[in-house]
Amino acid sequence: MVYFTKYAEKKFDILNKHKVFFTREQIEDVIAAPDKVTKKGQYLAARKNGLKVVYSKKGEIIKIITFYPVK
């Protein structure tokens, strides 16, 4: 089960104002098949296509904390 925090939900609007568009599916795809994952308390999944996702995982529950574009 994947769910987005309130901040992560707001992040879509924040990025849209800057003409940066991501979908929920893109965020979930990064977690499902990342190019790289690091863990420092929380997980950081990255894709070479320019998207990083910070999330936590407890059992089968994945909580999306935030996400952001990268170069």
Language-model segment annotations:
Residues 1-71:
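Ribonuclease/tRNase effector modules and their secretory precursors
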